[in-house]
């Protein structure tokens, strides 16, 4: 830690921290327009200027210095900032009355803050054409060229789709003498450029550029001219689509003239701390019919008569708690196959330290295994990109399908395409590289073999050739001496003889062929020697490595052994582990419920937020339209209730209702069995402490970040019962890694596209990416089909039909199939997420 004096206040800050971040952490305000926390500074607005030890600096890109004296608000600095705001206001359209940003516009705020009362500058205005991409509308007439959108697209999202490009606008130099240097710099930047979409592929469902725009230049298409910022009520909640559990804010306002019907107009995020994906931002249009269901007795009877309850991966902790208590009362089984596998995995792995998302950003090396990061957890992908861009980290992404999104993040992205089922072998490779001894490595060691080191052999041959040439050159010199020094033949011939001897020795010297060690097991898995050496070099170079384990690991045939190997890795090395839960609240469900493996038998099953013979779920009503899902009993959607979910970091986070729901919820159903809780949140402080939950009431849960980037959202789980079960497993050694018996041929992969996660996102009309069958551009051409056509695939006489879409990031000839297209007992993907299917030709 170092100390600085800011405006007479002594503060402590981290070495290497910027002056701006240090000031913000200490609660000292320095104005900015272009700066985004956790991103590279652009110094576009110059508003963050301060004086450090008597010299003017820009606080966003200047590192804190020990014992420095800093002033942030001298009269000179305030005059400079006022001049800058005057240049920003030149020709800015006076449409605040109808601008979507009015009331929360940073240009308005800064104009008032700096006291701009008149405009001394004038210049001819220019025509600037409107533009749009994805869900964004771009009005360059409102743009102040702060380049926040460019920065977040590059440093957070990782797409590099936006760029500041040159524009032929009026930018006379006549103000150079009358404007201050910084103000003229800002003026020139604004008058000589616009933002352009430069991506090589289309952008879908993101909107982070809209979120960070400080003015009305970038707006959400469906929000334009529908509501004013000051009319909207902000409800802070948690996104429930994936396990990231991002902080979101619903902007809600009455929709009818009587004020009885409310509507979510948009979703915002705290972009300084938590970028969000398109699902969190746009899939807010789906909820349950507000009246709910009246057939309470029918739902209770269905639970009495059922043999099992199948639960969805997004049920709340409180719903899981009630279902588990009901299981003990009625003796039924609880099914959720994904959460069950995750639970079994955790019982062996135990309680390894859970890094938070911020720790990904500070890593030197990130390794991913068994995960399609871009679809499973977008926030993890954003953090990886941030580490690559700002921390100069490297990425090793190992998966049977190459992800060009990850590969194109930067030059230090290394994507490895391996054989299906090789994850256990790859983890053994990592243990070997980290010098961790384990019985698991026996089969790997047994497959060791030596091969010729071609590079070293070539170098030796070059060296030998060079030595021969030098010897021959020396011999020639000796002969010349003999001819020129006839008076002393003995002395002249002696060197020649020696040289001949040396020459003979060089010729007869045998080269020992250099070898390298390879492993047949790795070769069979798709890891050749060159790849092995590159991974080894990156691991040895890194002093802060993080391993991301994806959901495909939990369904691996060797998941039990992989869990033991990962526990060993966590105990014996400094490598950090992040496990991506397979659904939004899989960690909460696995911690609370006693799950059973679902065997495909004829049972009476009640589905709670899942399909069943009797289905208790949201009916997925798009606002203003009829419900699209047929259910037997309507539950409130997760944007209509109070409760909690547990995210990837093990953080218990609050859900808040944005829309009204007048019907019954699960707490009303279970009251018929003698339960006393009148609503779900009466269970929040009763969640099992042996699973790591704390006796904290729902209304005491906080949900915000502070300026020093500290997370004050909910609370972190404590040590859970998983650790006790893992310690029991420790007495059993790891099994030797199993070789791949044969390569698994596949042409189908079970995975949602980006921004699709569950029924709610599937039914959303706001999202551009839909559930369906996705293929690469080359494969689409080979199939001789067009986007939007229906395609039918079959396996063992069962057919699957979906709409055909293009995945621009895909190269391989594979059908990427959305899970929502499958039935519960489908023949497709019975052995895992990779399968071989046939195409049904249309008549």
PLM regions: where:
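A generic structural signal for residues embedded in beta-strands
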Residues: 50-53, 547, 793
């Amino acid at each position: 830690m170092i100390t600085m004096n800011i405006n007479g206040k002594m503060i402590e800050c981290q070495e290497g921290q910027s002056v701006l971040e240090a000031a913000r952490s200490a609660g000292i305000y320095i104005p900015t327009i272009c700066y985004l926390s956790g991103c590279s500074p652009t110094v576009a607005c110059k508003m963050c200027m301060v004086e450090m030890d008597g010299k003017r600096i820009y606080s966003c890109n200047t590192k804190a210095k020990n014992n420095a004296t800093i002033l942030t608000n001298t009269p000179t600095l305030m005059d400079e900032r006022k001049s800058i705001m005057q240049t920003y206001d030149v020709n800015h359209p006076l449409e605040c009355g109808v601008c979507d940003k009015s009331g929360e516009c940073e240009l308005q705020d800064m104009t008032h803050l700096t006291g701009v009362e008149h405009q001394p500058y004038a210049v001819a205005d220019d025509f600037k054409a409107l533009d749009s991409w994805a869900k964004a509308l771009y009005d360059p007439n409102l743009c102040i060229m702060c380049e926040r959108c460019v920065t977040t697209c590059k440093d957070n999202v990782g797409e590099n789709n936006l760029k500041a490009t040159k524009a032929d606008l009026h930018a006379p130099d006549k103000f150079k003498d009358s404007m201050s240097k910084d103000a003229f710099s800002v003026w020139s930047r604004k008058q000589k450029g616009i933002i352009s979409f430069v991506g090589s592929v289309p952008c879908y469902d993101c909107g982070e550029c809209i979120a960070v725009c400080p003015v009305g230049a970038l707006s959400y298409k469906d929000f334009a001219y529908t509501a004013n910022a000051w009319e909207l009520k902000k409800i802070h909640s948690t996104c429930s689509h994936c396990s990231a559990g991002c902080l979101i804010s619903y902007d809600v306002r009455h929709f009818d003239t009587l004020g009885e019907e409310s509507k979510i107009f948009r979703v915002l995020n705290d972009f300084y701390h938590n970028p969000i994906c398109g699902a969190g931002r746009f899939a807010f249009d789906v909820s349950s019919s507000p009246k709910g269901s009246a057939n309470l007795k029918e739902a209770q009877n269905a639970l009495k008569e059922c043999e099992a309850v199948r639960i969805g991966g997004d049920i709340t902790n409180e719903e899981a708690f009630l279902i588990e208590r009901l299981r003990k009362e009625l003796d039924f089984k609880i099914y959720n196959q994904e959460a069950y596998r995750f639970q079994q995995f955790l019982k062996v792995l135990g309680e390894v330290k859970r890094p938070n998302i911020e720790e990904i950003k500070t890593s030197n090396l990130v390794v991913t295994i068994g995960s399609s990061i871009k679809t499973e957890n977008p926030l993890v992908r954003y953090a990886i990109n941030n580490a690559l861009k700002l921390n100069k980290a490297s990425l090793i992404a190992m998966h049977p399908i190459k992800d060009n999104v990850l590969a194109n993040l930067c030059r230090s992205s290394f994507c490895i395409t391996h054989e299906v089922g090789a994850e256990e072998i790859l983890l053994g490779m990592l243990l070997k590289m980290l010098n961790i001894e384990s019985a698991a490595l026996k089969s790997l060691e047994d497959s060791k073999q030596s091969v010729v080191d071609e590079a070293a052999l070539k170098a030796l041959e070059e060296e030998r050739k060079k030595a021969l040439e030098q010897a021959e050159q020396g011999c020639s010199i000796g002969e010349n001496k003999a001819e020129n020094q006839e008076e002393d033949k003995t002395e002249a011939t002696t060197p020649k003889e020696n040289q001949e001897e040396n020459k003979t020795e060089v010729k007869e010297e045998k080269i020992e062929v250099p070898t390298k060690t390879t492993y047949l097991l790795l070769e069979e898995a798709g890891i050749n020697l060159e790849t092995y050496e590159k991974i080894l070099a990156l691991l040895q170079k890194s002093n802060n490595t993080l391993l991301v384990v994806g959901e495909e690991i939990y369904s691996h045939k060797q998941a039990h052994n992989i869990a033991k190997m990962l526990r060993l890795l966590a105990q014996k090395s400094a490598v950090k582990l992040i496990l991506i839960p397979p659904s939004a609240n899989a960690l909460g469900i696995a911690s609370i419920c006693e799950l059973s493996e679902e065997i495909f038998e004829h049972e009476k099953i009640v589905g709670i937020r899942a399909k069943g013979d009797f289905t208790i779920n949201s009916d997925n009503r798009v606002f203003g339209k009829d419900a699209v899902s047929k259910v037997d009993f309507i539950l409130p959607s997760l944007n209509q209730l109070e409760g909690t979910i547990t995210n990837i970091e093990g953080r218990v986070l609050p859900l808040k209702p944005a829309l009204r729901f007048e019907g019954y919820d699960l707490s009303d159903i279970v009251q018929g069995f003698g339960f006393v809780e009148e609503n779900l949140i009466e269970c929040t402080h009763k969640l099992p402490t042996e699973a790591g939950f704390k006796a904290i009431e729902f209304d005491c849960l906080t949900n915000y970040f502070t300026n020093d980037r500290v997370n004050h959202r909910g609370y972190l789980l404590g040590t859970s019962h998983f650790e006790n079960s893992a310690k029991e497993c420790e007495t059993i050694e790891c099994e030797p890694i199993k070789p791949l018996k044969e390569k698994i041929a596949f042409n189908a992969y079970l995975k949602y596209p980006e921004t699709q996660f569950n029924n709610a996102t599937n039914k959303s009309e706001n999202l551009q990416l839909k559930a369906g069958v996705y293929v690469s551009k080359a494969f689409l051409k080979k199939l001789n089909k067009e986007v939007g056509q229906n395609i039918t695939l079959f396996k063992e006489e069962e057919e699957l039909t979906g709409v055909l879409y293009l995945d621009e990031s895909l190269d391989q000839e594979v059908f990427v199939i959305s899970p929502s297209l499958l039935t519960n007992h489908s023949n497709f993907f019975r052995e895992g997420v990779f399968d071989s299917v046939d195409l049904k030709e249309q008549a």
